[in-house]
């Protein structure tokens, strides 16, 4: 350790004039950043991508992957961003406003100034948000762009293809995007060994095995966006998005065997489709030099149809026709005072779900929910180093929320206070200690509070619980950060307490049916220590990023107590030579325990090579090389009544080879800075499966 710190201390630091200009951003004053620059903040990091990183990136996914953000996994080929520690969702924003994966894909990388990585979101952010990535860009005031991005597998039927265009004129900007995705997989496997403890004390064993599972899925998205902005005064944006997804079939021939009897085939099938139009209206107005007001309204309609058949034991089938209507409205006021920035706001989330089940399930499931949330927050700093960075920074906020549900005769209302405090103290301009404490709310999936009962197989049922209540989460953490031009490292110690949380509950009926539901139980706590390190082995040419963590889980249910320790790690190596970009990624999966369920995500190995020429970018992706039958997931249930071992395999994911071809032209663009502040999205249908 002494030698490591000696090595770090020898690295040179080039001071840059940095001025804190607002609550959420730090801007460089006429400085050209030639290497990735990281500024530690009270709630995360502000990162300035290097010129070479932007030149070698053809989309927002590509650039974010090169930044190697802690606890973040960027799948450029699959166009997804997720948290490696499963703490919650990753929220993506562009200039402060919520962005979806389509916005990230068509982002003009040349316009990006900085990336604000927030690993401790304040009270102004929504529920279940673990990380926020806010990409700051300059706005084009003229010109336009046209492009496409085609990514398709050569070894199986899997792909994602989009085409987009953007036109800028004066204060107006118009964007259009169309994306088409498809999956046609006929090579999945599933193995399950279950042991059921019957009423008479005997053990009943069942083996379920699927050899050639087949799934088809097709998706289409059309997005239109219009933006009118005067960056010094106002922003108005309207976005219309329509998603249509079709799953013609999922068909599985399963070999079923029970205690002392030969195996025989049974069948499971399903199909479905959904249609989701959404309209988002956003407005931001600057009130003088220091104050601003922003508002956002999102309306969403989701229509879902599905049919399911399960042939184990007595044939069981049902259909569902679901309609979901939702409205999310939010307003935020901000005042940038000299000692600190004050912000306050309110959020309203209304939803009505009407899911009608037919066939062997007869249940008209109408659920109304209403969430109201208000908050106030201050954010500031005390003292500065000579290069302009703050010595002590703080964020203090308080939120108050009410969540109410009504379903038939069942209804409840839940109030929760949400205080949060984060303090960051910099011993030097390179070394920072950050402390935080927060009380937040967790709400179970709405499907689990329905009054519906669905058969899973001949022995098991999934049962909704209308009396299920939200629970509070109490979290404390300390982060030690060290930053130099060539190395950045964070040590994080975190303890999360989930009291009266929603955990799985297994019960047995008199006729030996096993019911899975969720109930509020004592606690599910987690303690972990992690390290995230990024090292520029050869600046601008070879970069290594590693993550390693020890996780300890403490589960206390009504009838059990379980502890579990997991070791999770990952690493990324990126190289840039001429017009080539090469990436190698590996991890040991994510291992965890929640209640009486132990989950094992399998190890992952991926590599890619990109070649950039003119307006084109060609990329070859390889996932799970030298693996013919890679495991896609595994899990264990360690309940006293039901013990189960599950393993899934995706043969099409072994030696998976994908090729990407991207083309983009930008003509006549001139840029200016823009700022926005709000985020919203709605996807939940409340359908129990």
Where are these regions (language model features)?
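Short, acidic, small-residue-rich periplasmic hinge/interaction motif at the N-terminus
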Residues: 17-53, 77-78
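N-terminal periplasmic accessory domains that precede
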Residues: 20, 30, 60-65, 79-82, ...
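Periplasmic plug
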Residues: 73-120
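Outer-membrane beta-barrel translocator/receptor signature
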Residues: 126-133, 141-190, 217-220
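Transmembrane beta-strands of outer-membrane beta-barrel pores
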Residues: 150-154, 169, 180-184, 240-246, ...
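Face-selective signature of the C-terminal outer-membrane beta-barrel domain
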Residues: 219-247, 268-410, 414-416, 426, ...
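Outer-membrane beta-barrel signature, preferentially recognizing the C-terminal barrel domain
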Residues: 412, 429-431, 441-492, 497, ...
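C-terminal beta-signal and adjacent terminal beta-strands/loops
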Residues: 613-689
